[in-house]
Amino acid sequence: EPVPEGRGELAVAIREFCYPQTTHPALENVNFQLKPGQMLGICGPTGAGKSTVLSLIQRHFDITHGDVRFHDIPLTRLQLDSWRSRLAVVSQTPFLFSDTVGNNIALGRPQATQEEIEHVARLASVHEDILRLPQGYDTEVGERGVMLSGGQKQRISIARALLLNAEILILDDALSAVDGRTEHQILHNLRQWGEGRTVIISAHRLSALTEASEIIVMQHGHIAQRGEHESLVQQPGWYRDMYRYQQLEAALSDAPEINEEAANA
């Protein structure tokens, strides 16, 4: 059946999920609900099940034990293309075509106006970068976007996803090549853009999750910790350890210039 009109709650209740031809569960007891306007953060070590959760929401596989529901209807009962048209997904390695920057952003909505294209580019903090290119939005990006940095490519694909105006935005480690300050700006913009929309962010860098209404920490295919950023940084566990480590790493990577200046003084 077609997906009902209007914004609805996304409810994930996975009792167990095994990939085809495997017996070891990739996920066990993963449950969460997301109302329109909420932002969910997903984190955890590599291989913990983050990508599996995201692929089940996109219905790349069907679940036999449990279900994912939208508007309280299991995804298996919804038309697949109708469901996927409600999602905008940005992966870690975005795909750009050998075309202009503007056409790359308008990929999912070729009829979009220049004004709409620039609006989403601003939300994705990439508008200023584009204006610095030789022909601005009409600059050809070359094969697979070779002219652009990794962070610029990620931001262009975030702009492309925002232009789709989908109800559910999924960022799968899609800010990994973006610097901390820009990441902060994009997340702030997403909060405002996302009023009434559902945003799911999976990330290795935990600073990307501080705005989330709930964060789930995946380990070995299940939810090891959950809560808001402020409460998780105060609980002993993977999240607090990793957050402290990343804060330290960020502070150290900002420091070397000072030492060089002192050495040259």
Q: Model-derived features: where do they sit?
A:
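ABC-type nucleotide-binding domain
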Residues: V3-A265
